[in-house]
């Protein structure tokens, strides 16, 4: 199995993200940014002076704080084991934004998982919303990277939690081309695309990315809120937020579940919260 190119064994993509709503109105926007493709067994060895510009922390991806010191890969393995998928010694590539200047917000992180023989095992799409919620969609292997899954996680207050996603997430190479469609009764309601061009990651590439896309991950979060406010001001109705459970910053309220090969314990229940989002404070990615 070949390694990723470059001095750090990782890839940086200069990306263009587009969002197009097809119902009930047709607003669209385009945003430029930068994404990393990394091997979870060989995260980029970013030198200490450059670490404020790029970091990959388990707590930025874990569905729940584990308090167990698991790596990103180990936490993903536990998730997969809960769905009867055994990763073994296979490779996992992760496409994501890096933590930069103390902050990260990832609307979509994608994991491409292969078994020990290098065969495609599954694809995992990890979605974050600005409520602080996180959710994963598990897709079976497909030669074209295509898959469908019901939508069961709140992302935008302008869409209810219904319909299904049609995802096209092929493992990238020199080019990155991802597409996500939201299909609802009556047809396609929303399409998001991410296109990018690869360059090997290293000190020079990281500095170039920092200069080309300063405050990139902050800009994503602010841009989402700005677009949400504009949609709200245009008269688009807002759907109440479904009940959510807050994520403690460092550890769960009770003892976390054990590893996949250990007997899980029962965590202390956390009261559910409900509220109606206001576009000025919490407007997730469309």
Put a short name on every predicted segment.
Residues 1-269, 273-286:
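Mature, function-bearing regions of proteins
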